[in-house]
UniProtKB/Swiss-Prot annotation:
Source organism of this protein record: Metarhizium majus (strain ARSEF 297)
Name recorded for this polypeptide: Hydroxynaphthalene reductase-like protein Arp2
Binding of NADP(+), residues: 25, 45, 71, 98, 162, 166, 195, 197
Family: Belongs to the short-chain dehydrogenases/reductases (SDR) family.
Keyword entries, A-Z: NADP, Oxidoreductase
Record: active site: 147-148, 162, 166
Function: Hydroxynaphthalene reductase-like protein; part of the Pks2 gene cluster that mediates the formation of infectious structures (appressoria), enabling these fungi to kill insects faster. The product of the Pks2 gene cluster is different from the one of Pks1 and has still not been identified.
An annotated Gene Ontology molecular function: oxidoreductase activity
EC identifiers of the protein: 1.1.-.-
Length: 267
């Protein structure tokens, strides 16, 4: 990871909403935006205590934050989330749709419930988050959606459900970028590879050659790091820093793009 330095508060005066921000990648994004001066809405669904801990961590950076509970798979909840965010901070400049879930299951065993659970959160929710962002963002705002390297990977078994749910988001990104352009709102997606979170801990062994359940985490990290020219796996801060760039005015000419965040990994 790059060395730690005092971060310029280049997003001072901006307000960001990050879904699924109580842990993992979402937490990393929320904290990096806050370090740069943004006020942050920390959305969560069930993990109230971790979300409040993120708010407390943000306060230590000198930025403001509020935790708002909302189940973003339900459109009325999405609407309420945006209304409460606006009531608290007055405006929105940046919306990051981060929430997601992952399933590995043989295609013949996937149930309707599996399909709906994955697509409701990974795909449907992201559409309506982006829709509400378009309606409520100030002109010149930023929308960042969450895809995955899995959307374009081949050779990973039992992965169609997750890969398909993320591939759809890439289509949303390109289309929304066209529709939002007249308001100078940019829309991009990020597509991370493995990032050290609780989801990584549960599923990363699937991506390791000859991986198996119960593999020691050190072996998993070593196996995945071997694919990366930088010799390591990602941490949430890596993803947050890229989102912070996309949120910055300097990123205006980056629009309608899906940005792979793999450290150059080739798998």
């Amino acid at each position: 990871m790059a060395s730690s330095e005092e971060t310029p508060r280049s997003l001072a005066g901006k307000v960001a909403l990050v879904t699924g921000a109580g842990r993992g990648i979402g937490k990393g994004i929320a904290v990096e935006l806050a370090k740069r001066g943004a006020s942050v809405v920390v959305n969560y669904n069930s993990a109230e205590k971790p979300a409040q801990e993120v708010v407390d961590e943000i306060a230590k950076t000198g930025s403001r934050a509020v935790a708002i509970k909302a189940d973003i798979t339900k459109v009325p909840e999405v609407s309420r989330l945006f209304q409460e965010a606006l009531q608290h901070f007055g405006h929105l400049d940046i919306v990051v749709s981060n929430s997601g879930t992952e399933v590995f299951k043989p295609e013949e065993e996937v149930t309707e419930e599996d399909y709906d659970r994955v697509f409701n959160l990974n795909t449907r929710a992201q559409f309506f988050i982006a829709q509400h962002a378009y309606v409520h963002l100030r002109n010149g705002g930023r929308i960042v959606l969450m895809s995955s390297v899995a959307a374009n990977m081949s050779g990973i078994p039992n992965h169609a459900l997750y890969a398909g749910s993320k591939a759809a988001v890439e289509g949303f990104t390109r289309s929304f970028a066209v529709d939002a352009g007249h308001r100078k709102i940019t829309v991009n997606a990020i597509a991370p590879g493995g990032v050290k979170t609780d989801m990584y801990d549960a599923n990363a062994w699937h991506y390791v050659p000859n991986g198996k359940p119960g593999m020691p985490m050190e072996e998993i990290d070593k196996g995945l790091a071997a694919f990366c020219p930088l010799g390591r796996v990602a941490v949430p801060q890596d993803i947050g820093r890229v989102v912070a760039f996309l949120a910055h005015p300097d990123s205006e000419w980056v629009n309608g793009q899906v940005i792979l965040l793999t450290g150059g990994s080739v798998t």
